[in-house]
Amino acid sequence: MDKIIKSIAQSGAFRAYVLDSTETVALAQEKHNTLSSSTVALGRTLIANQILAANQKGDSKITVKVIGDSSFGHIISVADTKGHVKGYIQNTGVDIKKTETGEVLVGPFMGNGHFVTIIDYGTGNPYTSTTPLITGEIGEDFAYYLTESEQTPSAIGLNVLLDENDKVKVAGGFMVQVLPEASEEEIARYEKRLQEMPAISHLLASKNHVDALLEAIYGDEPYKRLSEEPLSFQCDCSRERFEAALMTLPKADLQAMIDEDKGAEIVCQFCGTKYQFNESDLEAIISDKA
């Protein structure tokens, strides 16, 4: 089961979130039938949103959009504070040549664009923030967002590793943030440790990558685990929701679906689930609109 572990240095100088998101990204790949590069780009976006959602309280909904002018198109993810995330990538078929080490490149092909976040607190006034893509690698772009929009300097690492068949082998990441209590000496020590950390891909390839990430972040510094919470890919779409959407269409449009298509098929963008509405279903909707 996927999980996020929240921890804090015993000194109170900084905190860290460490994630195992392997099942989340694997299910997203299965749902959308994504090829290698699309899988990694979508996976990184999902992991970034899992981190962002874990930082919120209440019943907030968090939307992350990675909008570039590349062949990936838009990448959209929606998460809640209960560990659920869903998402899709506009172009599922991007399969760019890997590096010599087998890693999939994303940044060089993302193009210019923006990292957009929308946090809906349920009050009717969602908070929206837009920052430019810095590298297109998504992790660095997320870190830049946290620094610029939330005024919280953060170290972010996230990645998706694929096997020889381009299926998700492991996915996960981390976030480290300095807290106000940190002294200059503690900040300097923290920055030095981060600079010396192995690459995120190397840590994810470890036998137990969650422990490997924590060890790399804290080193010999004492810390305590605050919580361990489950994560999952979960879509909240339903037939009732799409039926309500059909109710908003003009009667003429619904009648055209009956006359021309003998019904309607609606496919959820986030999970690929198909919902069929036959002629009788559409006629009932028209009748309810009367």
Curated annotation (Swiss-Prot):
GO biological process: one example: protein refolding
Name of this chain's protein: 33 kDa chaperonin
Protein function: Redox regulated molecular chaperone. Protects both thermally unfolding and oxidatively damaged proteins from irreversible aggregation. Plays an important role in the bacterial defense system toward oxidative stress.
Superkingdom, taxonomy of origin: Bacteria
Disulfide bonds: C235-C237, C268-C271
Protein modification: Under oxidizing conditions two disulfide bonds are formed involving the reactive cysteines. Under reducing conditions zinc is bound to the reactive cysteines and the protein is inactive.
Keywords: Chaperone, Cytoplasm, Disulfide bond, Redox-active center, Zinc
Major site of localization recorded for this protein: cytoplasm
Compartments where located: Cytoplasm
Molecular functions per Gene Ontology: protein folding chaperone; unfolded protein binding
Pfam family, one: HSP33
UniProt cross-references to InterPro entries, sorted A to Z: Heat_shock_Hsp33, Heat_shock_Hsp33_C, Heat_shock_Hsp33_N
Gene that this polypeptide is encoded by: hslO
Similarity field: Belongs to the HSP33 family.
GO cellular component, one term: cytoplasm
UniProt-listed SUPFAM superfamilies: Hsp33 domain, HSP33 redox switch-like
